[in-house]
Amino acid sequence: MSKLFQVLCWLFIASFPVNVFAAEDGVDKADNAFMMVCTALVLFMIIPGIALFYGGLLRSKNVLSLMAQTMVIFALVSVIWVIYGYSLSFSEGNDFFGGLSQFMLKGISVESLAATIPQFVHVAFQGAFASLTVALVVGALGERIKFSAILIFAFIWTTFAYLPMAHMVWGGGLLAQDGALDFAGGTVVHINAAVAGLVGAYLLGKRTGFGKEAIKPHNLPMVFMGTAILFIGWFGFNAGSAGSANSIAALAFINTVVAASGAILSWVLAEWVFRDKPSLLGACSGCLAGLVGITPAAGTVGIAGAL
């Protein structure tokens, strides 16, 4: 029986389409570790960062639904990404879509490299970006849409909005050929998600109960915790977009701190002038505004530009 079990184990290992005993030639271990940490930080932004931030802004009766939506959307987009999303974004194709040459990550093994890191790490890092982008739209649609509908939307929007935009900007498509610069996702992530959220909110209309009852953030400490997690995760988001632990990553890192700090102060001062006192929600809003603002240029502008 034990011999049969050993044979089955070896057959199972042999069925994998990658060489699990591949050499490490060409991999920079420092860059690899750096990018894996950055990927984990971006994933941390989704679960629990976005879930806590948006959950605190909603009414208490809708918090669990939004958190569940965030987690399931992350899972859905991750599966889409490894099946065909990465291929349509980063393989050779036309101006708008890549091809299907890397369908199900075909042709990618543990020996495959993206610069100085394993290509699997690049797949995971970019997949985290895709999941984050779709999760951002959830906040605009919160308390407006059914669970099943948001999943259908996530599938369609990821396929026909996020993937072509990623290819056009980062995959050698139309905008990349025109010289577009988007260091960490100002276009691919934030403008993309913002337009989807705005159009979705407009088409779906007002939230249930709007105008009939007070709709206030039910838990500001939860919003603060979500903001703090997003702030920390953003270092992986921006610095990781350098692709390695180099001086560009360092510039993106310090620019992230400076931009967020300047935006927090600006928002709080504006509240002091127009509302006589600052607020925690205002400080959190300013922080995220600064982080979003510096994202596309974190690795290209100087400190003064970030401020």
Residue positions per predicted region:
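Hydrophobic alpha-helical transmembrane bundles of multi-pass membrane proteins
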Residues: 2-307
